[in-house]
Amino acid sequence: MIARPARDVLSSATKKQFRFRGCLAARHEPYHTSTSRAGQVAILPATTDDKTLVSVFDSPRSNAKLSAFATTGLFNHSTVTHPRALNSIAQGTLIRAHVLTNRILRAKESREELFKVVKNLDRLSDMLCSVIDLCELVRNSHPDRAWVEAANDAYEGLCQTMNELNTHVGLYDVLKIVLSDPEIVKSLSPEAYRTAMIFWNDFEKSAINLPAKEREEFVALSSEIISLGRMFLEETTAARPPAKIPPSDLAGLKDKGMGVRLQLQAQFTQRDLHVYPGSLQAQMIMRSAPAEEARRRVYIASHSSTPEQIELLERMLSTRARLARLVGRESFAAMALDDKMAKNPTNVARFLDSLMDRSRPYARRALRNLSMRKQEHLHTPPFPTIQAWDRDYYCPPEPPAPPIPLPRLTFGTVLMGLSRLFRHLYGIHLRPVKPIAGEVWHSDVHKLEVVDEERGVIGLIYADVFARRGKASGAAHYTVRCSRRTDDDDVQGDNDELTRMYPDLIKQSEEFEAVGRGPIPGLPGTYQQPLVVLLCEFARPSLGAAVLEWHEVMTLFHEMGHAMHSMIGRTEYQNVSGTRCPTDFVELPSILMEHFLNSRQVLSLFHADSTSSSSQPIGNHDEDPCHSIDTYAQIMLAALDQIYHSPAALQPGFDSTRKLARLHDEKGLIPYVPGTSFQTQFGHLFGYGATYYSYLFDRAIASRVWKDVFSSSPLSRETGERYKQEVLRYGGGKDPWEMVSALLKAPELASGDAEAMATVGRWKIEDEVGLPGRH
């Protein structure tokens, strides 16, 4: 059965997906913002906790070392003090999972137990997930190879059990009994019923109701897809042969640094210059070579593939299609979209067609402007065709910049701004605390308590933000522990002879699971406290505080959007907590956070002493004239993803390159370049097969939410509270269409049908063309 990955980031294409993984503070009176004289918005002053973020995170730590005398283990698990502990905990967890599985299988013998099946399935999922997610984090961040290897071993063993549970006929049969019983179904809360249906749908996707031979084929095909996908991902970054550039084509390079050096090299050797795709030289030539032929050669070299690379991709696509046909679906897209907001490929097509129709005029206008630049440069007849290799030369990509002048933003300053923003919106702030010796895996790692003004500490964030050898690249939000209600677990009912045979292993597993539990003021029962890790690769400062580039500030806001979703989405079932929601909904909170950086009022929060700010909106300070071209290119990629995962993948003679060329011929604005095959570098085809539209989709919704809900008063507690109550608090425990419909007061969206998808497509261009351009 399939579950939401713990790492929520679009680039996490290599991550497996699982379903069966699967302290109180003083109470404060709620804060309220107010508007003072016209044009000014009153801002809550920075608190001591806010200012402490700056001093703690901006203090030099380059020489800091972890204590050799640990008093606790990772994430305050007292038993996780040594790599071997991961193996012991994994073994104990597997035993307990086996016992709980047997209990669920026996539930058909007891009506009382049938009422507990959904809860126990979620417990089983969480029991395994909690260890898998910890191991996943260790695999990607720990500097000690012994820890990484131990995490890998534990991870693989637990995943094997997951795969067995994914196709467990007995569990499926018990759940079928539960969902066929009107009395039991009526007793389930909406959140519990949604959890049950998630398990049911994932079982159905796993060929659970097919004969044994077909189930074996399903497992074999699934394993083959994973293997092909890994090989495909390796090839997406494989070196391509160099472009050979004659010295004469390097004349007039606009770059006076590297360009001059290349010209001198070519003059000295009198040989063709070999330029490797992806290199700094290749990027420089695409941006600054007046000679079109030089750019054409680099472009073709950068988008070339070997026959073997193309064949590998097409094997992966056809194997996915065979898997879908095995379970009775027309295509892999139909199978993948069944539990998404989009529901089916037809609805995705409506969204993308609507998006294309609205985006095309703006992209054409931008291309016409580039054509005029090309005409002036080459002295051609009017409006020469813009080719794929012209884009960066006539409109060089620029790094994103803040919409208004700002002082240098240190990491601590940005965290202070985020804390102040969360206080305005949700009555929540960030409080730095010193980790106990042994609690973190590197001296760079900081610990933050997430503090609610009424409920005290509601979660923990560990921030590991500086690049280092062996650490995963990119930025990501890892969910290490999910919210879940635990006081009604009925652990006593798990008693089994097996647990008495391995008391030490069972004890370790139970102690591991018990960490982070406690009451929540205002709610009945006991809950697991969510714990997330923020991994980034910001440049480590050689001296003083880390100063962030604007794109890094945007990244931090994005990832903290995921973190707040995890903190506020305190559900009773871990399978729907926080970011455990559909792929085409999970990016909404994180993308929405980026929009706040377009507000003067929010930007003023980076100044510790600010108490007021102009409420005047920021205009199009630096609108990128080519932004619409890039947006259209993203829509084309999403359309290509749908084509590749359609029934066409099983047609005789399926040719992925021909499909790419045909898409460009029918809907593209820049001509396809014969001989190129970019699709072999489109890594998201593996990790986000048939769902690449999701990022565009959530961008569209976030744009509308910002425009209609937040833009006029981005620091309003009333508005923030409405967003928290209508969206964030549910995690994945409610239909996303119902959440969006309620938030936007648009009841026509609630059904989430094809027309709703088309409506969202129309939002995209209406909002985005007015936003400052970002590359």
From Swiss-Prot:
Catalytic function, reaction form: Release of an N-terminal octapeptide as second stage of processing of some proteins imported into the mitochondrion
Annotated active site: E559
Any one Gene Ontology molecular-function term assigned to this protein's record: metalloendopeptidase activity
CDD domains: M3A_MIP (cd06457)
Compartment list: Mitochondrion matrix
A Gene Ontology cellular-component term: mitochondrial matrix
Binding site for Zn(2+): H558, H562, H565
Free-text comment on the cofactor: Binds 1 zinc ion.
Entry's family note: Belongs to the peptidase M3 family.
Name of the protein described by the UniProt record: Mitochondrial intermediate peptidase
Annotated organism of origin: Schizophyllum commune (Split gill fungus)
Gene: OCT1
